[in-house]
């Protein structure tokens, strides 16, 4: 079990073999759509992986990929062609993962970002809609979906190419403007938004509540995951304990105030007790012993 490093901070046992980090299902869909993800125990047994599609043998980076509920990744075109070649009367349980023979169609009561993304792909083809219990698409509708999908992929590729050209061109202008005593244009940033997947109101609300910079505790440090098993020296433990007094904390302020007050009272009582003990030990000198002796011995002088 591990903690995902995304803002959701979910506990997960899935591990990305390529980036070597714990990932939750939200990160699988958003940040690791083409990565090899399996359990952390599987990675401990064998960390070797091949980032190729098991159906065609080519790299997963060369096409659109889909992740099944068993977390295996395939090219969508390869998986669609394989499952479409099955008979039309194939039961939903007959559509299985080529790698582990797990049913492709997720359960209806499964709440999972990976399952939701898979359902979006399955809803585009008739064999997928048949397994999901949806109405079948006509030939015109399926052809229009394919045309829209191809246009979307072409436009996204063109936007990415234009972005690269723009960065190269702007970088060249800045390099030419430096010898003349300053930059030719002021630095700026370009915000590209997907025209086919506009952000919803929920995304705006979520982004408005997200802090600009993640708050890092100065006590644990930035390399908390790297040295969490390192042996702490007494100096490091003392420094960590003293830094808690001025570090920002999520606890109520009255707890810290009461802790300081009780610590001061305890220190004052210990100081008074120490002074009293030292006073009693200093009063037991030889003069007091002679006056309190019941059988004094007189001194004889010759």
Swiss-Prot record:
UniProtKB keywords: Membrane, Metal-binding, Phosphoprotein, Transmembrane, Transmembrane helix, Zinc, Zinc-finger
Membrane topology term: Single-pass membrane protein
Ranges in coiled-coil conformation: none
Transmembrane segments: 258-278
A molecular-function term among this protein's GO annotations: zinc ion binding
The keyword Ribosomal protein is assigned to this record: no
Modified residues (Phosphoserine): 217
Name of this protein: Zinc finger protein-like 1 homolog
Originating species: Drosophila pseudoobscura pseudoobscura
